[in-house]
Structure formats: structure tokens, C-alpha cells
Design a protein with these regions (language model features):
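Noncatalytic, solvent-exposed loop/strand surfaces
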Residues: 1-369
Length: 369
């Protein structure tokens, strides 16, 4: 299956298309029902924007014109095996470097490029399986900056300056589905997945090491305990963990032990009434003061609070129509419609998209009085 991918630059206030850039690619490596275009969010850095296609076409473009400054092809240049559901991890700008999950055979799961030229600066982590789908993130812990990488075999901490490994913890990831971003709260570091639930690490506050605090014991996402977050990343507040399980249930857990303290199924009540089971339930959560903006896969913008006592929904509005099908394999095209695109927040507005449109809506209270 051949396709055309593109990036658009729009005027923030009017939505006018300022420029676009397209490139040809082949989706033959992907499951056919997922041959639907790029997944990774564009990364803007000064006068450059970095974009990544679903098959590993990485481009550095000029922000003003869309002109190509440099380009790499993961499969052609590095021997990358494109995973079943496409390449999703957006490159991360760190100083003069651009760091990316590349899966370069056989010793370059992660590569650092000169962000101005595209020249390779370092590579790290042996490729022992699929690259996964999780986003790179840098956290301060143990007196250093740690680049956290979650791929389909392990959770790894690297020195972002050199690529040297600080620590590495093997994690059994079902079907290569390392998707949600690793989440830090205090000395806690969490990853969560569909089949094996959550793994909580304790970060050493004095040096760059980590140990397992607790780990989910069940491969069954329908089990009543723990948290099997699949796409949307959970959150950690003090000594408590909150997240959306694969069946659309919101759960609160004790971060120290992993024990469930409450469950709420009302957020997806409408979809649950229509479909029975909200498989692949997803919401993207962004903190705003003592509350969270939540974008549900039904296209709703929800404002809510999470406490050890439960989930408190403050407001909800239908923001955008879900247009993509959830699920797995051939049956995906017959499942409920979802929106798995993460929105952007800027200048008291939210910008969101589906397969058909891009919208911008005000979040300013004064606009609704």
C-alpha cells in the first residue's frame, strides 16, 4: 500500500493554510487497517519543525516556508523494522541534539542527531525486538538528567549528553505494545500497558539508579485490580496513581503498593451504553492547576479533579467528532469510532483534529460569560 503523508502550517488565529509539504511513502510494513498517515506530533524548535511519518521518514523543515533542511529515512538509512502499527514516537529536542527512537540495527534503538544538520552524534541500546510506540522524555532524578526510554523489551535510563546507560530494567511487554509515556511523580516512575498492567519503579534520589517497587501480575486487562492503561498516560499525584484502563474505567491506586482504592466508570457511560464494553478506552490528561483537562476518545473535553476519594467531573463539552475506528486487525474497521489524536494547548486555546478537520476553541472564561 503506497500513500502520501503531509504536514501543514496554519495561521493560529484564522486557520488559513500557510504552507504544506508532502512526501510519498509505502505502508506495506504496516497492518493494512492502520495505513492512515503520521502519528507523531510535529516538534517546533525556533525556526525549525521536525516531523516524522508512520514509516520513519524524519524531516527537518523551515518553519516559515516548509522547505526541507535535512531528511532521514529510518528503514533505508538505518535498517529499521517498522512496527505493526507504525512509528509513533516524536523526536525530542535537547539543546543542540534531536533524540529519537529509531530502532537502527543492531545497536541503535535510540539515536541522537545534530538538530541543525542531521548528522549522527551517538547511538545507544541494543535492538533485541520491536521498538515500541512510547514517547521519549527527560526527567531530573538522582542528581542528573535522565532520558527515559520505554521500548518493547525494557525500560531504560540514558545520559542524554552521551547515550551512556544509567540503568536498565527488563519489562515483559505483550505484543510490543509499549505505548503510554513513562510518568514520573516524586521518586516514582511508572509505565503501564495492556497485557501486563503497570510497573512502578522507585528512583534513587541520590544517584541514577532505580529498583522495582511493584509490578502487575495479570496479563488479563479485565482483572479487577491494578491498572492496564494502554494509550493514554496515567498521572501521579503525591502517593496516588490515577489512570484510564483499557476498558474505559478510571482507577485510583496507591502508588506505594499498586493496590486499587477506587474505580469510576461514568466518564464513558454513553459509549458503554451503546457498545457494552469500551475496549481501548483512552483519554489524554494535561494538568491545569489543581484540575486536569481530559480529552476522551469520544471527542469530549472534560475538566476534572482526581483525589484519593475519587473522580470529580467539573465540566464536559463535545469538542470534535471521533472519525477513526478502534480495535485490532480486520475487525478494527467495524468497532466504535474514536479520536486518538492528542490536542495542543496554547494562548488560552485548545487545538484539536480528527481525520477530517482541525479546530481551535477558546478556553478563556471571559469568552463564555
Amino acid at each position: 500500500i503506497d500513500g502520501t503523508e503531509r504536514v501543514l502550517a496554519l495561521d493560529e488565529n484564522t486557520g488559513e493554510v500557510l504552507w504544506s509539504h508532502t512526501w510519498r511513502t509505502s505502508y506495506r510494513m504496516l497492518m493494512a487497517s492502520y495505513a492512515i498517515g503520521p502519528r507523531a506530533t510535529p516538534t517546533v524548535d525556533d525556526d525549525r519543525v521536525y516531523v516524522l511519518g508512520a514509516t520513519g521518514i524524519l524531516l527537518c523543515l523551515d518553519v516559515e516556508s516548509g522547505a526541507v533542511r535535512w531528511q532521514r529515512d529510518y528503514a533505508r538509512d538505518y535498517g529499521t523494522s517498522v512496527p505493526t502499527w507504525g512509528i509513533t514516537s516524536a523526536p525530542l529536542v535537547d539543546g543542540a541534539r534531536l533524540i529519537a527512537v529509531v530502532g537502527a540495527e543492531s545497536d541503535g534503538m535510540v539515536l541522537a542527531f545534530d538538530k541543525y544538520t542531521g548528522d549522527e552524534q551517538w547511538r545507544s541500546v541494543k535492538v533485541a525486538g520491536e521498538m515500541g510506540y512510547s514517547q521519549l522524555v527527560i526527567y531530573d532524578a538522582g542528581g542528573v538528567r535522565q532520558l527515559i526510554v520505554w521500548h518493547a523489551s525494557a525500560l531504560v535510563s540514558l545520559d542524554p549528553d552521551t547515550g551512556n546507560i544509567y540503568w536498565e530494567q527488563p519489562v515483559d511487554v505483550g505484543a510490543g505494545m509499549a505505548i503510554a509515556t513513562p510518568v514520573k511523580g516524586g521518586d516514582y516512575l511508572l509505565v503501564s500497558q495492556l497485557y501486563n498492567g503497570s510497573t512502578m519503579m522507585r528512583l534513587n534520589p541520590d544517584r541514577p539508579t532505580a529498583t522495582i517497587l511493584w509490578q502487575g501480575q495479570s496479563r488479563n486487562p479485565d482483572q479487577p485490580e491494578g491498572l492496564h492503561a494502554t494509550i493514554g498516560s496515567p498521572i501521579i499525584i503525591d502517593d496516588f496513581l490515577y489512570g484510564l484502563g483499557v476498558n474505559g474505567e478510571i482507577r485510583g491506586l496507591d502508588a506505594k503498593s499498586g493496590a486499587r482504592i477506587w474505580e469510576d466508570i461514568e466518564m464513558n457511560a454513553e459509549a458503554r451504553a451503546q457498545w457494552g464494553v469500551v475496549r481501548w478506552g483512552t483519554a489524554f490528561m494535561v494538568r491545569q492547576g489543581d484540575r486536569y483537562f481530559m480529552n476522551s476518545d469520544e471527542g469530549n473535553l472534560i475538566i476534572a479533579r482526581f483525589t484519593p476519594s475519587g473522580y470529580e467531573e467539573l465540566s464536559r463539552t463535545s469538542l470534535i467528532e471521533p472519525t477513526a475506528s478502534a480495535g485490532f486487525g480486520a475487525t478494527r474497521l467495524y468497532d466504535r469510532l474514536v479520536n486518538w489524536s492528542h490536542p495542543a494547548y496554547a494562548n488560552r486555546h485548545i487545538v484539536h483534529r480528527n481525520d477530517r478537520e482541525i479546530i481551535r476553541a477558546s478556553l478563556a472564561a471571559a469568552d463564555y460569560q
